């Protein structure tokens, strides 16, 4: 336990470890403890604090540092408070202890995804306020629930509420991903999650007979069509040295059907997780799914469990004032950026769909990707470097001059 209370530990690291100890783990996150923690941070930093309960027990906490020119749109810094479940037996240390080893690695669920970023936002604001800075644009920090289970009772609802509109967000930052290289990963868009169930109906009967037109035979044809598409996209990814977010992925995740070994089922189903690349014509792709089902035979249908249609791409053109401010910080700090499409889904998709350009960025280079993994961890030096980077980013973004639409 020597890692606790170590003399000389940076206060930002201590705060980070404290936040990691709050058990906001799905499926029963302690959101109340997280909100209380954030309220105390607001009190200490002299920030405005608003709590918006989007559904009972699911609170979006908004901390606000007012700018000097309220006519300008604001900067939105978003992070989620929940974390994914753990298999404690596979961890070297308690995932909710906030343990720091002798080498400076901080272990905990949320160390990379994304409690580190939440504290980096807060500590960057604290540093700027202590130094006496004031900026034209207001900075809002939103801490939202439910992201790890889709954001359906979090950001998806929040962006539809008047409290979100009142923030008048002009530009947003959300989570990114660790990078094992020298470059920092920046997400400017993300793939659309399509979860669907294919259901096949056919003739039932005794398991000893060669029955024609069975549900299994027809479902097999659809599965083959989809997995052939998967292989094609996999080859495109590998042969063209693309990033995962640039192609469409699909995985067969569930198979259901049957009641007994000797009964041919009348119905069988297969579930698929598609992540559709931003450049895909979504209407045409849905028609392709329909054609695969029709080609399999009569009685084959599909239904969506999740279907995201609001694909948005945030500008990374040098003429864009937000991107110019963001990328300019990295040029000044002589840090490399690597632009990517997020291969998974984050709350940034809801923000972009609400008309607010957003980038996904977590300042973790030279760091293995360990989100959702056993022994999720982050080195304290990388974490503190991230506070430095956010300090510069907030200063630049909150100082972007009035846009033509704001004049």
UniProtKB/Swiss-Prot annotation:
**Protein name as it appears in the record:** Aminoacylase-1
The N-acetylalanine modification is found at 2
Question: Which function does this protein serve?
Answer: Catalyzes the hydrolysis of N-acetylated amino acids to acetate and free amino acids.
Swiss-Prot/TrEMBL GO biological process terms? amino acid metabolic process
Q: How does the cofactor attach, per the note?
A: Binds 2 Zn(2+) ions per subunit.
InterPro entries xrefs = Aminoacylase-1_M20A, ArgE/DapE_CS, Bact_exopeptidase_dim_dom, N-acyl_aa_amidohydrolase, Peptidase_M20, Peptidase_M20_dimer
Cross-referenced NCBIfam families, in alphabetical order? Ac-peptdase-euk (TIGR01880)
What molecular function does GO assign, one term? identical protein binding
Quote the record's binding site residues for Zn(2+) 2: 113, 148, 372
**Family named by the database record:** Belongs to the peptidase M20A family.
Alphabetical list of PROSITE patterns matching this protein: ARGE_DAPE_CPG2_1, ARGE_DAPE_CPG2_2
GO cellular component annotations of the record: cytoplasm; extracellular exosome
Q: What enzyme class is recorded for this protein?
A: hydrolase
List, from the UniProt record, the residues annotated as the active site of this protein: 82, 147 (proton acceptor)
Positions of Zn(2+) 1 binding: 80, 113, 175
Q: Which Gene3D superfamilies match?
A: 1.10.150.900, 3.30.70.360, Zn peptidases
Native species: Sus scrofa
Q: What is its EC number?
A: 3.5.1.14
Enumerate the cofactors the protein uses: Zn(2+)
User: What are the protein's UniProt keywords?
Assistant: Acetylation, Cytoplasm, Hydrolase, Metal-binding, Zinc
Record's subunit section: Homodimer. Interacts with SPHK1.
* Record keyword Acetylation present: yes
